[in-house]
A protein has these predicted regions:
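Amphipathic alpha-helical coiled-coil "transmission" helices that mediate dimerization
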Residues: 561-613, 617
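Hydrophobic alpha-helical segments and their helix-loop junctions in multi-pass secondary transporters
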Residues: 67-97, 101-108, 115-120, 124, ...
Length: 642
């Protein structure tokens, strides 16, 4: 509503991007969900690192980027909750009503952190722990929709006097006069669609929690309808709020302040509950997803490096992971509160959200390229991510704090060291465009360019090529296991490690079932490549693909690629070499043909020269007697005496 009051119909782009993704990119979502299920990914960092050779370095980079990128998003939710609380002490929404918003934000952040720690980290397996959270998200979505529809119906028929009167109000309001900026609309639509795919919260719900691809068929039409209903009364509420409330009222709070100004306290409370539940669920799911990424891709690799080879058989890894996730939750929410404090907590909610959208959108090139292009490499993904993230920080995140907070006003206006074409919001001399469009343009353009160029100049490792084949051709490889040779592994060591990660009952159940499948009466199965792959995937659901791969590697002795996989790579290389030889042969034939054409052309040129010389000589011989005959004829004609 606040976005509509400030920018007119531009708020539609925030709903348009996700709707277009659900309607037009359902085939991409289906492939993404299939990859997530077959690879047992736990987060967007797990997806990207698993695709590019299960790289720990890449996983750490994506995790750090996600934490920093989502920090403004968490600050946005804290600001939303604290502003909503302040309304009940000042119904006009013009001041803070005597409430210390910074102090209130601290207590809100602390409460959300404690709730998330207590109820979000009781279990370890990422594929089992969030069923209740998903139900809570569905409930809060319904509550938010009901609250917004109730306020909208009250505004249209209870305040404006009916639909026709409401349309007249809209036509006469400032919102009806807003001009459409094509470049900004395009950028925001792309940005919202990218954020829909890349936000850790959305990825968690869309991919990690999705256990059936058929759910996408329902979501492809149900979710756009939900967004349409959410946006149905946004403009009427914004128009009535601008008409009824004081000029300095906060438009982000019109959903609360308009009912309160009309004496509808119950409706305002319903609206508050809808907004509060929405904000808290966003914070909880976002921090859960981020804490999983931090524990799996930052804490566990560091812990394993200190523990050495004994890390797989000693110590309770489950306790380490759970403790790391709890600490990560506290740190992540603390970072959100710190951003809220430093930025002053006074910016428009939508503007703060766009900053996070641009940050997480940097995952999109590596994600799409990894799923559709086998040529993408770890070097390319890392290059694109680092370049895009650096541009986002410089052009969007740091300027959002305001002048003279992080970046000086001189640097913002003149550029570093007076270099004008390096100004954060006029990079490379491009001036006069919207700051959001500017940040989206340069960050995604340079990110994609870095990804493509880095992939073209680097050669993927065998595991990268195997993972690339499984991602790109996921529907053909979903049921195939690749990657391990179990000759160096011991079943007893695998059992101890699995118990540390999965827990005793789950590990015993897994090993007993595998022994039965192999036809053994023994308790422990043979460490076949298929079984090693199954253990790795089960562990990846708890500690991430990269960490699980590293732990299995310690037991197997580093034999992370089987002979069959190496043969597959060799076959592929042979095919590429044969194709290259065919191209070389074709090129040689074309060169021979071109040489023959040049020889023929030279002969034709020589013949043409000879022809011209011959014609010139014949013409001279012909012209001489003909001239004489003509002269004598004229003399005979004119000379009668002769």
């Amino acid at each position: 509503v606040g976005y509509a009051a400030r920018s007119g119909m531009e708020f539609v782009t925030i709903y348009l991007g996700p709707s277009l993704v659900m309607i037009g990119w359902w085939w991409f979502l289906r492939k993404l969900v299939r990859v997530g299920r077959t690879q047992r990914v736990t987060s967007v960092a797990d997806l990207i690192s698993s695709r590019y050779g299960k790289s720990n370095v890449l996983a750490i980079v994506v995790t750090v980027m996600a934490v920093i990128g989502v920090t403004p998003y968490i600050a946005l939710q804290l600001q939303s909750v604290t502003l909503s609380l302040s309304i009940f002490s000042d119904p006009t929404g013009t001041t803070d009503g005597g409430m210390n918003l910074v102090s209130a934000g601290f207590w809100v952040a602390l409460g959300l952190a404690l709730f998330t720690v207590l109820f979000g980290t009781r279990n370890l397996n990422a594929n089992e722990r969030h069923n209740g959270v998903v139900i809570a998200i569905a409930v809060e979505a319904v509550v938010k929709l009901v609250a917004l529809l109730a306020v909208g119906i009250f505004v249209v028929w209870g305040v404006a006097g009916g639909l026709s009167e409401m349309m007249t109000h809209i036509d006469n309001s400032e919102i009806g006069q807003w001009q459409v900026d094509g470049s900004r609309w395009t950028a925001l639509t792309v940005l919202s669609g990218a954020a829909f795919l890349c936000l850790p919260r959305m990825f968690q719900v869309l991919v990690v929690e999705n256990d059936d691809e058929r759910h996408l068929h329902i979501a492809s039409w149900a979710f756009p309808i939900y967004l349409m209903m959410m946006s149905l009364f946004v403009v009427p509420i914004a128009v009535v709020g601008l008409d009824l409330l004081p000029e300095n009222s906060n438009p982000d709070l019109f959903v609360l302040t308009v009912p309160l100004s009309q004496g509808q306290g119950g409706l305002a409370i319903l609206s508050f509950l809808g907004g509060f539940s929405s904000a808290t669920s966003m914070v909880i799911v976002a921090t859960l997803a981020l804490s999983t990424m931090v524990s799996n891709h930052v804490v566990m690799p560091i812990w394993l490096s200190f523990q050495g080879h004994g890390a797989t058989v000693s110590g309770d890894v489950r306790n380490v992971v759970i403790f790391a996730r709890r600490v990560s939750i506290l740190v992540i929410i603390a970072l959100g509160y710190l951003y809220y404090r430093v930025s002053g907590g006074s910016g428009a909610l939508a503007a703060i959200g766009l900053i996070s959208f641009i940050g997480v959108a940097q995952f999109l090139p590596a994600m799409i390229g990894g799923i559709f292009w086998r040529g993408g490499t770890r070097v390319g993904a890392l290059t694109g991510l680092l370049v895009g993230f650096a541009i986002w920080i410089y052009t969007s995140l740091l300027p959002s704090f305001g002048p003279d907070v992080v970046l000086s006003s001189t640097l913002l206006e003149q550029g570093p060291f007076g270099i004008g074409w390096l100004r954060p919001q006029a990079l490379f001399g491009i001036k006069g465009i919207d700051p959001t469009v500017h940040a989206v343009l340069w960050s995604l353009l340079l990110n994609t360019s870095g990804f493509i160029l880095g992939s073209l100049i680097s050669f993927p490792k065998p595991l990268e090529r195997l993972q690339g084949a499984q991602f790109v051709n996921v529907f053909a490889h979903s049921g195939h296991a690749h990657g391990w040779s179990g000759s160096a592994a011991q079943s007893e060591d695998l059992m101890v490690m699995a118990q540390r990660i999965l827990g005793g009952p789950e590990a015993q159940k897994l090993f007993r079932r595998e022994a039965q499948n192999q036809g053994h009466d023994r308790y422990l199965p043979e460490p076949t490549p298929d079984f090693l792959q199954r253990v790795e995937r089960e562990m990846s659901a708890s500690v991430g693909a990269a960490t699980a791969h590293a732990m299995i590697s310690q037991l197997v002795g580093g034999a992370s690629v089987s002979v069959q996989d190496l043969m597959a790579v060799a076959d592929e290389s042979a095919q590429m070499l044969e194709y290259s030889n065919q191209l070389e042969a074709k090129s040689s034939e074309l060169l021979d043909t071109a040489r023959q054409l040049r020889d023929v052309n030279a002969k034709l040129t020589q013949i043409s020269v000879q022809k011209d010389a011959f014609l010139s000589q014949i013409s001279h011989e012909l012209r001489t007697p003909m001239t004489s005959i003509r002269s004598f004829s004229e003399i005979l004609r004119d000379g009668n005496e002769l």
